[in-house]
């Protein structure tokens, strides 16, 4: 299904390459590796050659190597690719920056072909007007130069040191993908294109901030277009278990998925989590969804809050850290929810404005107590981040998240009161369709099967709260909208509980819901939307995700 022509050019035109750290300016690859164009499990090990500052790749699984792992290209059969990488556990003693660089290099090498596909699919979804490309490039170049300068100038600051680890990983991904492209005789992706992929969430707000548009009818607004999602944390009545789940909403052009398991041997006293499992995409060094299980005992979920107050978007500046970067740094450094919130709040870009739920499983003693600090809720808008401990609400049974701000200040500044005035209570926090459905049905969750069920729920033809709208429900199917079908909506679900999380284990399903007899999504109805590398039909079951490397 996926056609790759030799020497194929990628959009947009290459910008000036941005600066890379000094170590990347040496010859960066050595050795040959066999080509892989087909599905299957592909093993690889990266070796750091310190004398030449080069990387050698061998298609073996060598635990003495500096980074090793595999990519299971099973997208056509399960809807998911699976990537697992361990770095820094080899025979060499390496700096944290080199460990992160090699982890990124190996991921870029193993997943380069799907990175190309994913960029091809997403670029036209975000760049509707070619005139915006130069503005985006200029902003991202300024933001990167500002970030790298702070990393260089503040090496003794733990926050900026960890930001440097993330940037090293990105540099490695770029060069690893470049190495793979040269072997496949493809034109390599530029650094801007890889930055573009990682910033997809941020671009949802950055592009409108750079391109003022005339006011349009709010009635034409499609909630899934901004990457909206549904999330639920459910506590059983006697605190016997705590479940957490997330269902992503966005364009179906984003359905090229990779579930990732990382284990990086970072030696830094300020690093709280160096092992994590999360849902993700090709070329992304973050989840985007978000759904993370962290070795610190934290769980991170997220849903997007739109900013209807366009004046706020004018306050976005490049001298800031993008949301994906701040999430990664907070994930690495935070021991608890409050610390995560404080770290995430630093250098707020005002892009990818979300509600984050930080669940601290260390604060949960089953059948006994859920201690203060177990749930922090964090919300961002341009110039402002608010967070609060909402454990008390969680103790009462559940926390639901459905793309409407919880904190009053964020709700008001984002423009929701005007939206409610113009469009009705469907946009209010308490009486949005998903608020009502979660309130009604969360009590039916008693086990993993019922948790999966509520997160895939769509009974729009019958449910009075849906009023016949296939997106006024937990798992949206905008492609079934009779008036104006679009290939977008809810396209996955990830579910786990406190027991599974201790093993970095989750259940994940890829594709739009087929609950209550809904037809499986088929691309043949929407062939005008690029979907390179994807299955034609999405009708998959839940898959067990669990790391297996030792």
Curated annotation (Swiss-Prot):
It comes from the Eukaryota. Residues 1-39 form the signal peptide. Pfam families: Phospholip_B (PF04916). Keywords: Disulfide bond, Glycoprotein, Hydrolase, Lipid degradation, Lipid metabolism, Lysosome, Signal. Residues 210-228 form a propeptide. It is an enzyme of class 3 (hydrolase). Its EC number is 3.1.1.-. The maturation cleavages that produces chains A and B are required to open the putative substrate binding pocket. Both chains A and B remain associated in the mature protein. The keyword Lipid metabolism applies. One of its GO terms (molecular function) is phospholipase activity. Disulfide bonds join 471-476, 475-490. Transmembrane segments: none annotated. The keyword Lipid metabolism applies. Glycans are attached at residues 72, 309, 412, 527. It is found in: Lysosome. GO terms for cellular component: extracellular region; extracellular space; lysosome. InterPro entries: PLipase_B-like, PLipase_B-like_dom1, PLipase_B-like_dom2, PLipase_B-like_dom3. GO terms for biological process: phospholipid catabolic process. Belongs to the phospholipase B-like family. Exhibits weak phospholipase activity, acting on various phospholipids, including phosphatidylcholine, phosphatidylinositol, phosphatidylethanolamine and lysophospholipids. However, in view of the small size of the putative binding pocket, it has been proposed that it may act rather as an amidase or a peptidase. May form a homodimer, each monomer is composed of a chain A and a chain B. This is Phospholipase B-like 1. It comes from Rattus norvegicus.
